[in-house]
Amino acid sequence: MSFSSDTKNELSRIYPEDRESKIAELAAIIRMIGSVSFYGNNKLSLTLSTENASVARLTFKLLKDLFKVAPEVMVRRGKYLKKALTYILFVSDTKAVRDILEETKILNRERGHVKLNYGIDRKIIRTVKMKKAYLRGAFLGGGSISDPEKAYHLEFVTHNLEHGQDLSNLINSFNLNSKVIARKNSYVVYLKEGEQIVDLLNIMGAHNALLNLENVRIYKEMRNNVNRIVNCETANLTKTINASLRQIESINYIKKTVGLDYLPPSLREVAELRVKYPDLSLKELGKMLVPPVGKSGVNHRLRKIEEISNKLKERRVQ
C-alpha cells in the first residue's frame, strides 16, 4: 500500500464530532469526487466515485448520519493493467440530493432559481474546526502525497479553478504557501516543502503519516550530512596526498641533482621524514622533529624545499 493510501486510511478513521464539521468534510468530498446530474421534471441525482474503500465507507456513513440517506453502492473493476476497484455511491432521490447539496452550500437558491456554487462558501468554513474538516475531506476525495523517500509533494486535484483558488486560500490561511497550477482539464493545489507538508498533515489530523514523514526527513538529513562530511574528508585527503606527492617529488629532485646535504639541517630533517613517511600529516611530521615543530612550521619548511627544487629546475633550463 502506498504512503498516500495509508494517509487516507488514517484520515478516514477520524470521524467529526459536531454536525458542522461533518457537513464541511462531506462538502469537500462531494466537491472532489461527486457529480450532479440534472434531468427532466427538475430531478437530481448525486454520484460519488473513489478508488479508496475507506473513503467510500466514510462518505456512506456521513450521508446516512447527516441526511438519513443510504446510497446505492456499486463496485467496478478497472479494465486496464492494475484493474483497481472503483467504489460508487449513488443517491437518486431528488429531495435528498437537494437537501445534501443545499446544506453543503454546493447548491444555492436565489429568487426561486437554483444555482451551483463553484467555490467554497464561507459559511462552510467559518470556524477553525470546520476548516480542518474541509481540508481533510478535500484530501480524502482528491488529494495525494508522494512517498517521502522519493520526493516531498502533496497535492489536491479539483476540476474547477474557482474551487482550486479557494482551496489554496484556505490552506494558506494556516500560514502555508500552496500554489495552484493547471494540469490538462484539472487544477492542482500543491505544496512541495517538507516542513509545510508536515504542518498540513498535522492540521488535517494525520499524525501517523506526519511522524513517518518526519522520520524520513530526519534520516535523509542525517544521510546528507554524513555524505557531506565524507565528501569533505575525501577532498581533504586527496588534497593531502597530492601535496605529499608534490613534496616528495621536489625532495627527490634535490637529492638527485645536488644531494640533500645542499639543504640547511632544519629543511633536510623534514625532507628525510617526508620521504620516509609519505602518509603522515603535517602535524604528525612536526611531532617527530627534534625539537617538535607545529603544523604551520612544517608547512613553511616544505614550501621552502619546493622553492629550492623549482629554482634548481630553472637553472637547469637556463
Curated annotation (Swiss-Prot):
Alphabetical UniProt keywords: Cell cycle, Cell division, DNA-binding
Protein's UniProt keywords contain DNA-binding: yes
GO biological process, one term: cell division
Transmembrane segments: none
Signal peptide: none
MF-aspect GO terms: DNA binding
Ranges of the DNA-binding region feature: 281-314
Superkingdom of the source species: Bacteria
Pfam families with a match to the protein in the record: HTH_WhiA, LAGLIDADG_WhiA, WhiA_N
NCBIfam families attached to this UniProt entry: DNA_bind_WhiA
Stored HAMAP family: HTH_type_WhiA
Reported function: Involved in cell division and chromosome segregation.
Family: Belongs to the WhiA family.
Protein name: Probable cell division protein WhiA
Species: Caldanaerobacter subterraneus subsp. tengcongensis (strain DSM 15242 / JCM 11007 / NBRC 100824 / MB4)
Gene assigned in the entry: whiA
